[in-house]
Amino acid sequence: MNIVPISESAVVCSLPPPASIQQQRQLWAFARQLQSEQDIVEVVLGMNNLTVFTDFFVDFKPLVQRLEQLWAELKVSDFQGRHIEIPVIYGGERGQDLSDVAKFHQTTPERIIQMHSEPIYTVYMIGFQAGFPYLGGLPENLHTPRRATPRTVVPAGSVGIGGAQTGIYPFSSPGGWQLIGYTKQALFDKNQAQPTLLQAGDTVKFIVEGIEL
């Protein structure tokens, strides 16, 4: 693990590429352990890295030594994410790229739905928006380039494919992913103690709630 300071109160801990589920599991377990450590204010997970925010004026050298020791003693088996099922309505006005994705892969919309809803995905990280899950585990034969021209508005709840990943937009925003459906499930609720439905390390299964072709 490489540990580099990025400010007076933050360091980035990164692993060598490429990102993998094994390395992400290590980072998830490490982040959970760090949350109970003294002087650590926040831990933000990324892809193949995490950022540790500390109280101001924490000495860098002792901090790095402590992080290295904790990393060496890490027990990944202690980490267990949750499993969440998310209902999806595929196609229709809210999944308007489904036909284009099917054409790109020279198959039918029904087959795309089947391939997308069969796997169990893993939340690699939360980013872009509060609660936006970057999901690993998309079958290689569903990898699809992003749209050449991003949309100025993607409705909240939209389910899309972007390259080798799939995800869900918690809020309305611009976006360039291929939209294949939508969910009514809220991914963010500021009134909850844990406002994001999904967290890094959770697993997700899409359930076909409906099909609009």
Swiss-Prot record:
Catalytic activity as recorded in UniProt: 5-oxo-L-proline + ATP + 2 H2O = L-glutamate + ADP + phosphate + H(+)
GO molecular function: 5-oxoprolinase (ATP-hydrolyzing) activity; ATP binding
InterPro entries, per the entry: CT_C_D, Cyclophilin-like_dom_sf, PxpB
Pfam families: CT_C_D (PF02682)
Keywords: ATP-binding, Hydrolase, Nucleotide-binding
Catalytic EC class: hydrolase
EC assignment: 3.5.2.9
Family recorded in the similarity comment: Belongs to the PxpB family.
Entry function: Catalyzes the cleavage of 5-oxoproline to form L-glutamate coupled to the hydrolysis of ATP to ADP and inorganic phosphate.
Subunit structure: Forms a complex composed of PxpA, PxpB and PxpC.
PANTHER family with a match to the protein in the record: 5-OXOPROLINASE SUBUNIT B (PTHR34698:SF2)
Official protein name in the record: 5-oxoprolinase subunit B
